Amino acid sequence: MFVKKGDKVRVIAGKDKGTEAVVLKALPKVNKVIVEGVGMIKKHQKPNTENPQGAIVEKEAPIHVSNVQVLDKNGVAGRVGYKVVDGKKVRYSKKSGEVLD
């Protein structure tokens, strides 16, 4: 998967289109990512010892990886490619040619 935890991404589809944020978690088995502040859902929690009343908690839901583009250091969104530099496989932005890793 071309997106990793900590990458700055731009959402390119959906209700949060245009939002730029950081990837909190990558889920490669299901091709989804959790992006900070994107795809917020309300989750009802049962009462427990920490929260005796119960609560409605807002949290980020996973979005499909095809709905985000990785931003390089200059803030330019583009596709991600792979190349070998000094015997090590690195990710790079196909638009700017800048190494991401």
UniProtKB/Swiss-Prot annotation:
Q: Which GO terms describe its biological process?
A: translation
Q: Which Pfam families match?
A: KOW (PF00467), ribosomal_L24 (PF17136)
Q: Name one GO molecular function term.
A: structural constituent of ribosome
Q: Keywords, A to Z?
A: Ribonucleoprotein, Ribosomal protein, RNA-binding, rRNA-binding
Q: Which SUPFAM superfamilies match?
A: Translation proteins SH3-like domain
Coiled-coil annotated residue ranges, if any:
none
InterPro entries recorded = KOW, Rib_uL2_dom2, Ribosomal_uL24, Ribosomal_uL24_CS, Ribosomal_uL24_KOW, Translation_prot_SH3-like_sf
Q: Which CDD domains match?
A: KOW_RPL26
One GO CC term of this entry? ribosome
Report the superkingdom from the record.
Bacteria
Listed as disulfide-bonded, the cysteine pairs are none
Q: Which family does it belong to?
A: Belongs to the universal ribosomal protein uL24 family.
As for what it does, the entry says: One of two assembly initiator proteins, it binds directly to the 5'-end of the 23S rRNA, where it nucleates assembly of the 50S subunit.
What is said about its interaction partners and assembly?
Answer: Part of the 50S ribosomal subunit.
| Name under which the protein is recorded | Large ribosomal subunit protein uL24
**Which species is this record about?**
Streptococcus pyogenes serotype M5 (strain Manfredo)
Gene name on record? Answer: rplX
